[in-house]
Amino acid sequence: MVNEARGSGSPNPRSEGSSSGSESSKDSSRCSTPSLDPERHERLREKMRRRMDSGDKWFSLEFFPPRTAEGAVNLISRFDRMAAGGPLFVDVTWHPAGDPGSDKETSSMMIASTAVNYCGLETILHMTCCQQRPEEITGHLHRAKQLGLKNIMALRGDPVGDHWEAEEGGFSYATDLVKHIRTEFADYFDICVAGYPRGHPDAESFEDDLKHLKEKVSAGADFIITQLFFEASTFFSFVKACTEIGISCPILPGIFPIQGYTSLRQLVKLSKLEVPQKIKDVIEPIKDNDAAIRNYGIELAVSLCRELLDSGLVPGLHFYTLNREVATMEVLKQLGMWTEDPRRPLPWALSAHPKRREEDVRPIFWASRPKSYIYRTQDWDEFPNGRWGNSSSPAFGELKDYYLFYLKSKSPREELLKMWGEELTSEESVFEVFEHYLSGEPNRHGYRVTCLPWNDEPLAAETSLMKEELLRVNRLGILTINSQPNINAKPSSDPVVGWGPSGGYVFQKAYLEFFTSRETVEALLQVLKTYELRVNYHIVDVKGENITNAPELQPNAVTWGIFPGREIIQPTVVDPISFMFWKDEAFALWIEQWGKLYEEESPSRMIIQYIHDNYFLVNLVDNEFPLDSCLWQVVEDTFELLNRHPTERETQAP
């Protein structure tokens, strides 16, 4: 019977075996569904060519691997913030001393992999042939391919001492590395090489260095990024010289916004460049004033970039960030190249891994934890496209590694305690944390709550459409971790709820997901009888005992869009089977990210443990999206029933 409520133990979903997101991913996906974002299907060199043909200038960013695990967490946060500005790609340098090809969280390979898979950034991995045998390089390239990296910057690398000594049987020049990549991997990788506007410091002459650059391009390099320089005329002369010897691939200027006296000296020493005297004259008197130097560096970089862009010779700008963001962001904003409000291709964060290019459907439960979803589905061979399909046994990997640097909270323990409470005295203390997260107001100790275990980011813009309702229910112990308002045919360009191409319309069913007590659930089930034909619900405890009225455990589309010349796209679903995988993660976060802040057996730890053990996870969907959402009334009716005398209520335990 449709909408017949039923309870069960656990649907016994399995976490290993199948490698797709549904029982038969080939049957349930339609790979012919037109892509909402053509760039997802293009190689980097194709994106560049399309931008060059249209005259649409771009920017890109360089980062280096951090030295510590904490630095890795901070760098991933920086990736996420800078991704909002719309870089065409980022690149990650290769540090031989840091075991760059390993699986360490601070290695070049892992940082680049994280940028691609978990931050959705087109990424170039630097690779050097210095002190590496060809078989080692081949191994690194195979690993890069496996991790979803499709772009390599081929470099010779710097010698450990003062003089270059080739590895026995190894390569002596970047040209050799480019040839090796093309021989072993054909056209799989897009290859970038370095250009030196004043010539490489080890080259016999500028002309000799240009000859080597031409050899790298002839061997298969797709584009060039230059070393930093300080005057536009230096770059113009370099491009002219390249053109004269037949180099026709894109040449991107390397831009270094001066951010401090010490960092400038170090970079100049490494690159063996001479700083123009007019720049020295400005910097020397203010060398101890970091703010003044940074402001001057921004002004200088903006002026240089404008001259480059106005020349018509520059398709894009490549920034050496030194893992800092303020100066580069300010330069890009002043140039008008920073995208303040980027158009979302889909309502959730994308991965740039090639095998996920067709993916356009996900369960809503991971909306605020996209990195976790990507991690748990990383072993799938295919991804749902067009519709979620009959998901009778999705193979979600188990999430036990909460310590992984790309899944950890961006806030250190001390900050989390200030936000969530040095000491909890009751369940109501927990309610207050949720309330302050939603309100944005400081807590009783004067600290703002900027994250929760289930959401490490600021509130989504659409939350503002139901902020007062959310505040009201959280004060009552409806601890919301995910929600969306109902939307009926809003333009896809809407700044709050829009997504997808221009000219479309987006729709949403109201959705509410929360933790609450057993007593509240018992009253809620009584109230839901009145809304049986309108509201779908799924209620589960930490042990997996659950009750739902989802018809035949079928997925329910809760977000969809209609766009010119395309089929309906439904990128977000409420899938009852996937919910049972999500509930394990959702409950575990109480302990892993909140409870473990406190000493074992402490009152604060015991309060979190009690909620983990006794509360239920609930999701509600209001199917009547054209009408005002009834979910708030459902909650109000629930508490009205709770406030009656017990003899007036008929209870039904789940």
From Swiss-Prot:
Name its co-factor(s): FAD
Ordered alphabetically, the record's keywords are: Allosteric enzyme, FAD, Flavoprotein, NADP, Oxidoreductase, Phosphoprotein
Functional summary from the UniProt entry: Catalyzes the conversion of 5,10-methylenetetrahydrofolate to 5-methyltetrahydrofolate, a cosubstrate for homocysteine remethylation to methionine. Represents a key regulatory connection between the folate and methionine cycles.
| UniProt GO molecular function | methylenetetrahydrofolate reductase (NAD(P)H) activity; methylenetetrahydrofolate reductase (NADPH) activity
Q: Which residues carry this modification: Phosphothreonine?
A: T33, T93, T450
**Binding residue positions for NAD(+):** E62, F63, F64, P65, P66, R67, T93, W94
- Any known activators or inhibitors? Allosterically regulated by S-adenosylmethionine (SAM).
Name the EC number(s). Answer: 1.5.1.53
GO biological process per UniProt: methionine biosynthetic process; tetrahydrofolate interconversion
Record bears the keyword Transferase? no
- The UniProt entry's coiled-coil ranges are none
| Cited Pfam families | MTHFR (PF02219), MTHFR_C (PF21895)
**Record protein name field:** Methylenetetrahydrofolate reductase (NADPH)
Query: Region (Disordered): which ranges?
Result: 1-41
User: Which cysteines are disulphide-bonded?
Assistant: none
Q: Where are the Phosphoserine modifications?
A: S10, S18, S19, S20, S22, S24, S25, S28, S29, S102, S393
Q: How does it assemble?
A: Homodimer.
